[in-house]
Regions:
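Two-component/phosphorelay signaling modules centered on CheY-like receiver
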Residues: 15-34
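Receiver (REC) domain active-site loop signature in two-component systems and cognate sites
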Residues: 60
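Alpha4 helix (beta4-alpha4-beta5 surface) of REC/receiver domains from two-component response regulators
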Residues: 23, 67, 89-104, 114
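Acidic catalytic/metal-coordinating carboxylates
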Residues: 37-41, 64-70
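Active-site beta3 strand of CheY-like receiver
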Residues: 49-56
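Non-catalytic signal-transmission and effector/linker regions of two-component phosphorelay proteins
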Residues: 1-10, 123-126, 130-133
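C-terminal output helix
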Residues: 110-123
Length: 133
């Protein structure tokens, strides 16, 4: 992926180690990465400059990933942003995220090959939706 084609991904997680690890993996694949430590900061960043994709932890204090997803999908001023929720393996509410507008989810512990496949598929979908018919 050339620098002019680099897609920007916003990673949202309340755990610093998770942010650092995901940032390193995504940057190694050639993506531009922006980070947010909570849902409120993520919404502010999205409204200021919508990313190409959102990688969003489902369980965070104050505003969880489900609420962030709901607010993004209700905001008609925002362009389409693919949302991948990161859920704990025991999270029985993963389907709730899809119902609220998330496009996909991945369970912890994260398989990074699977993560990259899902990221690429979501970005392809966005490109197809944005291309002239």
């Amino acid at each position: 992926m050339s620098p002019t084609q680099a897609k920007r991904i916003l990673v949202v997680d309340d755990i610093e180690d998770n942010l650092s690890l995901l940032e390193a993996v995504l940057m190694e694949e050639g993506y531009e990465v922006d980070l947010a430590k909570n849902g409120e900061l993520a919404l502010a960043k999205i409204e200021a400059s919508p990313p190409d994709l959102l990688l969003l932890d489902a369980m965070m204090p104050k505003m969880n990933g489900y609420e962030v997803t709901r607010r993004i999908r209700q905001n008609k001023r925002l362009p389409f942003i693919p949302i991948l929720l990161i859920t704990a393996s025991e999270d029985a509410n993963a389907a709730q995220g899809l119902d609220l507008g998330a496009n996909d989810f991945i369970r912890k512990p994260i398989d990074f090959d699977e993560l990259m496949a899902r990221v690429k598929a979501s970005l392809r979908l966005k490109d197809m939706m944005n291309s002239p018919q």
